[in-house]
């Protein structure tokens, strides 16, 4: 019974209006029943009390986008992405909001970030792994670690060294 829960939150917040957890939960509930503008007000209160609450900021961003406030949504998505640069949902939603306001370049940058992350995931590596492999390749080409792998761009079929699997047979 969502309406009953809503009246319970209203009553609880009448008793303790500064309870930001109550505002957060009521904001989620209001969003669930489609009362987006009042849900945004609840998340505004939570963010005022706890400016680093990234979940409240992200939820407000989603609601702002739903109500057509794309610039406000982009600002909130950017805040979350700045704090958590690997939060891919933030890039996806920001790209969608940027498309809505005609910021093609910004949307393409976010889409590129998503594509790059998907490729890294498919290839089983992260940016850190890719950088480490590039450093190993440079070391191998410079003759360092010569025991571990052969120099150059080719490898033998019998070579079992995983660092050489990117080389031509």
Residue ranges and their predicted role:
Residues 1-169:
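Alpha-helical tetratricopeptide repeat
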